Amino acid sequence: MYKKILIRYGELVLKGKNRTTFIKQLGSNIKEILNTEYEMEFDRMYIPYSEENLKNLKYVFGISSFSPVIETNKNLEDIQSAITKLINKNASTFKIAARRNDKSFELNSDQLNNLLGGFVLKNSHLKVNVKNPDQIFNIEIRKNSVYVFDKSINGIGGIPVGISGKVLHLISGGFDSPVAAYLLMKRGFKVDFLTFVTPPQTDETTIDKIKNLTKVLSRYQKESNLYVCDFSLISSYIEFTEFKSFKIILMRRSFYRIASELAKQNEILMISNGENLAQVASQTNESMAVIGSSIKNEILRPLLTYDKNEIINLSKVIETHDISILKSKEACELFAPKNPVTKPTEAKTLRIESKLDELKTYEEIVLNQKMKKFAI
């Protein structure tokens, strides 16, 4: 019955001079994620109808809504025939919503509403209710075809992945960082991932968990990378510092310096993470400022103001929850001190780092010799 799926751009039509670029990126993403061709018009796109395409459109950012449509010719009998195919036996009331985009068509929208409404009244059990109908028959008169449909499915909104460039995202096995990655994609970032492990304390189970999380997230983008960094050389070195309360601050500053160099190698400008204000000791205002001061890159924190319940609920929506809830050994948790500093200063942190003579050398070794890359 259905021949095509009509896709509406939503936010993209508001982007002025960048509009064409946004829509081309959306088309490219649809082609990659759904492995299908598309037809593009000013305010919408069409792809071939299939149940698989209908299901997978929920993974494409930049779509306001979409509808499976019957495509028919520009004559009244064919339009009536299409409406007949859509009549729902469980509905009691209906409304006709005609839209004449092609002004050369002989009937205007009001005339179409009246004629087609009369047809449905005469040829079905349905009664008219324009305020709260059970079923709405939408008829769009376009230049080359007429499209008839009775449902509109919400897309996930946002803007197309890739339009905002790339970001290197620090991911762990918890709830927060996968959700943060999703939100970055929603604002047009293509995301590469970096995770830190400390074998033998963290084993292959932990790495597999991270890989599985990135695979779920890869439904929203194609051809990204996961970098797995063996951080054990540095974690062992920092473990024996006399300033025990600063261990996590020192580790995370080291994380960011390594991430910054990796981003530079891959021509990525920004670093991101799943940090949430005041959730743990390293996420106080002072801690984040000191950790962030270790690099010049902009650090994006999409979850900064989210409640934990909001994060968990979103993880269920994007289907990372059931992976994140599995037990694993995270680097920061394994080496967290009993009494971590919550209000560090940059001056004191720099004094401590100045006493760690081998830290810079170890960071270079880890970056160049202890990094594995996986295509997702």
UniProtKB/Swiss-Prot annotation:
<dbReference type="InterPro" id="IPR004114">
    <property type="entry name" value="THUMP_dom"/>
</dbReference>
<dbReference type="GO" id="GO:0004810">
    <property type="term" value="F:CCA tRNA nucleotidyltransferase activity"/>
</dbReference>
<dbReference type="InterPro" id="IPR050102">
    <property type="entry name" value="tRNA_sulfurtransferase_ThiI"/>
</dbReference>
<keyword id="KW-0547">Nucleotide-binding</keyword>
<dbReference type="GO" id="GO:0140741">
    <property type="term" value="F:tRNA-uracil-4 sulfurtransferase activity"/>
</dbReference>
<dbReference type="GO" id="GO:0000049">
    <property type="term" value="F:tRNA binding"/>
</dbReference>
<dbReference type="GO" id="GO:0002937">
    <property type="term" value="P:tRNA 4-thiouridine biosynthesis"/>
</dbReference>
<dbReference type="InterPro" id="IPR049962">
    <property type="entry name" value="THUMP_ThiI"/>
</dbReference>
<dbReference type="Pfam" id="PF02568">
    <property type="entry name" value="ThiI"/>
</dbReference>
<comment type="pathway">
    <text>Cofactor biosynthesis; thiamine diphosphate biosynthesis.</text>
</comment>
<dbReference type="GO" id="GO:0009229">
    <property type="term" value="P:thiamine diphosphate biosynthetic process"/>
</dbReference>
<feature type="binding site">
    <location>
        <begin position="170"/>
        <end position="171"/>
    </location>
    <ligand>
        <name>ATP</name>
    </ligand>
</feature>
<keyword id="KW-0820">tRNA-binding</keyword>
<dbReference type="InterPro" id="IPR020536">
    <property type="entry name" value="ThiI_AANH"/>
</dbReference>
<feature type="binding site">
    <location>
        <position position="274"/>
    </location>
    <ligand>
        <name>ATP</name>
    </ligand>
</feature>
<dbReference type="InterPro" id="IPR014729">
    <property type="entry name" value="Rossmann-like_a/b/a_fold"/>
</dbReference>
<dbReference type="Pfam" id="PF02926">
    <property type="entry name" value="THUMP"/>
</dbReference>
<keyword id="KW-0067">ATP-binding</keyword>
<feature type="binding site">
    <location>
        <position position="283"/>
    </location>
    <ligand>
        <name>ATP</name>
    </ligand>
</feature>
<keyword id="KW-0808">Transferase</keyword>
<feature type="binding site">
    <location>
        <begin position="195"/>
        <end position="196"/>
    </location>
    <ligand>
        <name>ATP</name>
    </ligand>
</feature>
<keyword id="KW-0784">Thiamine biosynthesis</keyword>
<dbReference type="InterPro" id="IPR054173">
    <property type="entry name" value="ThiI_fer"/>
</dbReference>
<dbReference type="GO" id="GO:0005829">
    <property type="term" value="C:cytosol"/>
</dbReference>
<keyword id="KW-0694">RNA-binding</keyword>
<comment type="function">
    <text>Catalyzes the ATP-dependent transfer of a sulfur to tRNA to produce 4-thiouridine in position 8 of tRNAs, which functions as a near-UV photosensor. Also catalyzes the transfer of sulfur to the sulfur carrier protein ThiS, forming ThiS-thiocarboxylate. This is a step in the synthesis of thiazole, in the thiamine biosynthesis pathway. The sulfur is donated as persulfide by IscS.</text>
</comment>
<feature type="domain" description="THUMP">
    <location>
        <begin position="51"/>
        <end position="152"/>
    </location>
</feature>
<dbReference type="GO" id="GO:0005524">
    <property type="term" value="F:ATP binding"/>
</dbReference>
<dbReference type="GO" id="GO:0052837">
    <property type="term" value="P:thiazole biosynthetic process"/>
</dbReference>
<dbReference type="InterPro" id="IPR049961">
    <property type="entry name" value="ThiI_N"/>
</dbReference>
<dbReference type="Pfam" id="PF22025">
    <property type="entry name" value="ThiI_fer"/>
</dbReference>
<feature type="binding site">
    <location>
        <position position="252"/>
    </location>
    <ligand>
        <name>ATP</name>
    </ligand>
</feature>
<dbReference type="GO" id="GO:0009228">
    <property type="term" value="P:thiamine biosynthetic process"/>
</dbReference>
<protein>
    <recommendedName>
        <fullName>Probable tRNA sulfurtransferase</fullName>
        <ecNumber>2.8.1.4</ecNumber>
    </recommendedName>
</protein>
<dbReference type="InterPro" id="IPR003720">
    <property type="entry name" value="tRNA_STrfase"/>
</dbReference>
<keyword id="KW-0963">Cytoplasm</keyword>
<comment type="similarity">
    <text>Belongs to the ThiI family.</text>
</comment>
